[in-house]
Amino acid sequence: GLIVTNGDQTDTVWEYLAKGESWEAALRTRQFEDDAPNWTPRISGLQAGDGSYKLSILKSADPEGMACARFFYEYPAVPGLGHFLHTYVCDGNPVIPTFQGEPERVSIPADIDDFTRELWENLNPDNKISLFVRYTDLETRKYQQRILNKHSK
């Protein structure tokens, strides 16, 4: 499988899975980032060997950051279809509003470079940091991947 996150919860997920415990159990030990007043959500993704995948977002359940709301989603592998979670809805002042609702459905074109470019160009330039895109042939297990980072040349 493949684990992708926007924080150090990657290690927690890896450790739990290595012990035979669940992804959900791992993420129940974690919460949003302690960066009041925004309480940055923690987003995680896990792809299984058959191409199915899970997504999670951990966010503050209240403006004071006193409780964590945990959302888990599971999807089968459907060629050309994926789901997208992001940290924030838009800019905010003084508080940035966090993502709301279910993960967004996205069409995935056959060309990885076209898809990578489309995703990167549609991320807010002031907020984007990095992007990881991987295409995997489920029969041969061969994959292509792209990693973009706004701080790399």
Locate the predicted segments by residue:
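Conserved short alpha-helical segments that host acidic/polar catalytic motifs at enzyme active sites
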Residues: 1-153
